């Protein structure tokens, strides 16, 4: 999943016109780009044109952008429509710059919900460092977050669970952790089986009323929570034994049946919240 999303995002960036929000300062873009690659400066006649400088700078920042999106969402997301909003020089004559970049993230085949991610990178001869990250979601994102929050609240109340001290992972977050950390693979396999055998057959187009499993783990114990389309709340208690996660207990109780409000392709909530 990780490699595919990186390739898709890079293709999307290359197929969309990259634009600046403000009038360009070619010298700043040129100096910022040269700072990344070399301390050596070249005569003006040998410097590339502005469009090449701009596109090269965006390409150079690609993996820094991708890293910050993963840090925020907890898993890779595709993005497009990159914009450099502006570049400033830290000090007159220095090769230390702040570049403000904005991209649009999306969930499935260019469909909503959309996120607007604005990042500021400090570019110096020592490398690229992120200094700020701001996220702005659309109305659908807000609706999905509220749906997930209401669903999880109903499940927790059914089983009288207080999980504030437990780190949580949505389905895609858990999948990403399994890709980069072998200790999560057996845990993700449990969640994947829930989705494929229980939740996927209940999914309807264009909207569904179920959420994918949300996993809460602390040390070697945890819970996997989900709700069926008829409102049944389900709680899997899991435990790590000999390096593998196993289900030690399954419980279910009738809960609130949710309305069909979530687009069928949404596989997780946007940002983890308790």
PLM regions and their residue ranges:
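Short beta-strand edge/turn micro-motifs at domain boundaries
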Residues: 119-153, 157, 161, 233-267
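Sec-dependent N-terminal signal peptides of Gram-positive bacterial secreted proteins and lipoproteins
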Residues: 1-21
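Generic hydrophobic secondary-structure signal
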Residues: 1, 5, 57, 61, ...
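Residue-level detector of short, conserved catalytic/binding motifs and their immediate flanks
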Residues: 117-119, 222
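Short, cysteine-centered beta-strand-loop-beta hairpins and adjacent loop/turn segments enriched
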Residues: 104-115, 228-236
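Flexible low-complexity loop/turn motifs enriched in small/helix-breaking residues
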Residues: 15-98, 102, 148-231, 252-274
């Amino acid at each position: 999943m990780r490699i595919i999303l990186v390739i898709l995002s890079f293709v999307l960036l290359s197929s969309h016109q990259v634009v600046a929000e403000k009038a360009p300062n070619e010298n700043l873009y040129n100096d910022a780009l040269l700072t990344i690659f070399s301390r050596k400066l070249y005569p003006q006649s040998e410097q590339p044109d502005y469009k090449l400088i701009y596109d090269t700078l965006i390409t150079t920042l690609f993996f820094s952008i991708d890293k910050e999106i993963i840090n925020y969402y907890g898993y890779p997301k595709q993005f497009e429509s990159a914009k450099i909003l502006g570049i400033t020089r830290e000090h007159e004559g220095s090769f230390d710059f702040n570049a403000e970049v904005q991209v649009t993230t999306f969930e499935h085949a260019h469909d909503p919900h959309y996120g607007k991610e604005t990042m500021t990178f400090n570019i110096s001869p020592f490398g690229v460092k992120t200094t700020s990250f701001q996220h702005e979601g659309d109305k659908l994102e807000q609706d999905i977050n509220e749906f997930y929050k209401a669903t999880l609240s109903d499940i927790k109340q059914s089983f009288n669970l207080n999980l504030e001290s437990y780190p949580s992972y949505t389905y895609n977050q858990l999948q990403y952790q399994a890709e980069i950390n072998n200790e999560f693979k057996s845990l993700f396999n449990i969640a994947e089986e829930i989705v494929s055998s229980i939740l996927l057959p209940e999914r309807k187009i264009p909207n569904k009323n179920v959420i994918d499993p949300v996993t809460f783990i602390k040390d070697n114990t945890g819970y996997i929570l989900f709700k069926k389309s008829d409102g049944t709340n389900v709680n899997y208690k899991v435990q790590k034994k000999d390096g593998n996660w196993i289900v030690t207990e399954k419980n279910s109780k009738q809960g609130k049946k949710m309305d069909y409000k979530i687009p069928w392709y949404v596989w997780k909530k946007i940002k983890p919240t308790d």
